[in-house]
């Protein structure tokens, strides 16, 4: 091998983005109105009752106890969000307690 072959080659340079203006221009053209955001499947929901919130808190506490996770405000919030998302997604659960949140007390 001659010395020129032994030299380490520099990595290829990354290409710089030319002009971001076209992307910005496209985003400016996108108009999202409230009417566009509402889907036919969107339903108006009533605010939860105190009884529903209490039941949700109880279910979240029970879930954290079953999974042996320390009960902190953060873990309670995540457990509550998990329960709400499971109920709204219609995930089947053998527990009748989860259905109580969906249907009310």
From Swiss-Prot:
It is found in: Cytoplasm; Nucleus, Nucleolus. Residues 10-20 have a biased composition (Basic residues). One of its GO terms (molecular function) is protein homodimerization activity. Changing residue 16 to A: Total loss of function and dominant negative effect. GO terms for biological process: mRNA export from nucleus; positive regulation of gene expression; protein homooligomerization. Expressed at higher level in placenta, expressed at lower level in several organs and cell lines. Residues 1-49 are annotated as: Disordered. Changing residue 14 to A: Total loss of function and dominant negative effect. A motif (Nuclear export signal) lies at residues 50-59. Keywords: Cytoplasm, ERV, mRNA transport, Nucleus, RNA-binding, Transport, Transposable element. A motif (Nuclear localization signal) lies at residues 13-20. GO terms for cellular component: cytoplasm; nucleolus; protein-containing complex. Changing residue 20 to A: Total loss of function and dominant negative effect. Changing residue 18 to A: Total loss of function and dominant negative effect. The keyword Transport applies. It comes from the Eukaryota. Despite functional similarity, Rec shares almost no sequence homology with HIV-1 Rev and HTLV-1 Rex. Retroviral replication requires the nuclear export and translation of unspliced, singly-spliced and multiply-spliced derivatives of the initial genomic transcript. Rec interacts with a highly structured RNA element (RcRE) present in the viral 3'LTR and recruits the cellular nuclear export machinery. This permits export to the cytoplasm of unspliced genomic or incompletely spliced subgenomic viral transcripts. Forms homodimers, homotrimers, and homotetramers via a C-terminal domain. Associates with XPO1 and with ZNF145. This is Endogenous retrovirus group K member 6 Rec protein. It comes from Homo sapiens.
């Amino acid at each position: 091998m001659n010395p020129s072959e032994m030299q380490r080659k520099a990595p290829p340079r990354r290409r710089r983005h030319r002009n971001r203006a076209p992307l910005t221009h496209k985003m400016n053209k996108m108009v999202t109105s409230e009417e566009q955001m509402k889907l036919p499947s969107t339903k108006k929901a009533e605010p939860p009752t105190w009884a529903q919130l209490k039941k949700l808190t109880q279910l979240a506490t029970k879930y954290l106890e079953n999974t042996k996770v320390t009960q902190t405000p953060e873990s309670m919030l995540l457990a509550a969000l998990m329960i709400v998302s499971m109920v709204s997604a219609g995930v089947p659960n053998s527990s009748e307690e989860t259905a109580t949140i969906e249907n009310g007390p």
